[in-house]
């Protein structure tokens, strides 16, 4: 009798533990990255795509309206002035990739300069064939610097919440420090807190 009662107790404990313990995401499926999906009130992939699309179109329109050679651009350090984590590098990469693929822009990799300088030293050390060795003096010089910043405000009253983002991009002429192009994208999202019942 005691053995049966002990077995029942253990079985009940295991069942309750399985029901009440933490649950893991064990099944998933691929979705369309262009579909809008808002799971919470944070910056998400859809917001990034809206900003990128606006900036890409605006920059291409600016270049098309000017009789200038293919501009050479470097990127500023991205600035996130919101209270949440936003992957600004992912946003920059999204914009940069589309502009390069358009064939209208040339981007220089400022982040690789130190590694390239070290590679120059190695290739000039005698280990590399002279006719293939690369060295300083042939790098392109950027004419423009592209920068971006995202700010946000949050308003909450009762169960209602409004989140507002403003993304601003600009191009600065390195020779003159003149801001030659700028544009903004504003995003407002509304949320309502749902009560959780049992």
Across the structure, where does each feature detected by a protein language model lie?
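N-terminal segment of the mature soluble domain
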Residues: 50-54, 58-128, 176-182
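C-terminal/domain-edge helix-coil "capping" segments
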Residues: 19-70, 136-143, 154-198
């Amino acid at each position: 009798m005691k053995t049966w009662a002990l077995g029942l107790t253990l079985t009940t404990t295991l069942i309750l533990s399985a029901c009440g313990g933490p649950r893991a995401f064990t099944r998933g499926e691929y979705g369309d990255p262009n579909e809008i999906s808002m799971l919470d009130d944070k910056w998400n992939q859809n917001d990034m795509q809206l900003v990128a699309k606006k900036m890409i179109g605006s920059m291409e329109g600016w270049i098309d309206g000017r009789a200038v050679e293919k501009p050479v651009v470097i990127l500023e350090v991205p600035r996130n002035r919101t209270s949440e984590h936003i992957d600004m590098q992912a946003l920059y990469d999204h914009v940069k990739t589309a502009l390069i693929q358009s064939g209208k822009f040339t981007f220089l990799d400022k982040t690789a300069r130190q590694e390239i300088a070290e590679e120059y030293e190695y290739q000039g050390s005698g280990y590399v064939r002279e006719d293939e060795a690369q060295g300083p003096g042939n790098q392109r010089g950027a004419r423009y610097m592209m920068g971006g910043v995202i700010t946000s405000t949050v308003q909450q009253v009762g169960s209602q919440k409004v989140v507002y983002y403003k993304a601003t991009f600009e191009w600065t002429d390195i020779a003159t420090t003149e801001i030659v192009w700028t544009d903004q994208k504003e995003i407002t999202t509304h949320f309502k807190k749902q009560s959780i019942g049992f």
